[in-house]
């Protein structure tokens, strides 16, 4: 059994979670799922109403609007040019 001093002196390295690491985890979890519902990092299940576009981006229908956003759903506003392939995935799965 450890003494209090031994227990409190042991530190476990904690990695810093950044937008880049979160994006890479989203990309890893959804690899090969372009055109299919995204996989949640929380519970590993498909997120209904979403379509994974690839490169860490997703689309979802919000009423009559299609929202394209970073898959990690950050609060930052971002702009990104999407490719014709992304538009084909959106048209096939959301329209």
UniProtKB/Swiss-Prot annotation:
Site (Cleavage): 19-20
Pfam families named among the record's database cross-references: IPI_T4
InterPro entries: Phage_T4_IpI, Phage_T4_IpI_C_sf
GO molecular function: type IV site-specific deoxyribonuclease activity
Propeptide: 1-19
Species name: Enterobacteria phage T4
Protein role: Internal protein I is one of four proteins in a complex that functions in bacteriophage head maturation.
Designated name of the protein: Internal protein I
């Amino acid at each position: 059994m450890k003494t209090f001093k031994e227990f409190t002196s042991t530190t476990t390295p904690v990695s810093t979670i950044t937008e880049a690491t979160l994006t890479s985890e989203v990309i890893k979890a959804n690899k090969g799922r372009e055109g299919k519902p995204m996989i949640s990092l929380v519970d590993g299940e498909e997120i209904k109403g979403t379509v994974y576009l690839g490169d860490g981006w997703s689309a979802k229908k919000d009423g009559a609007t299609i929202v394209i956003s970073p898959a990690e759903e950050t609060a930052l506003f971002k702009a990104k040019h999407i490719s014709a392939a992304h538009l084909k995935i959106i048209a096939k799965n959301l329209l």
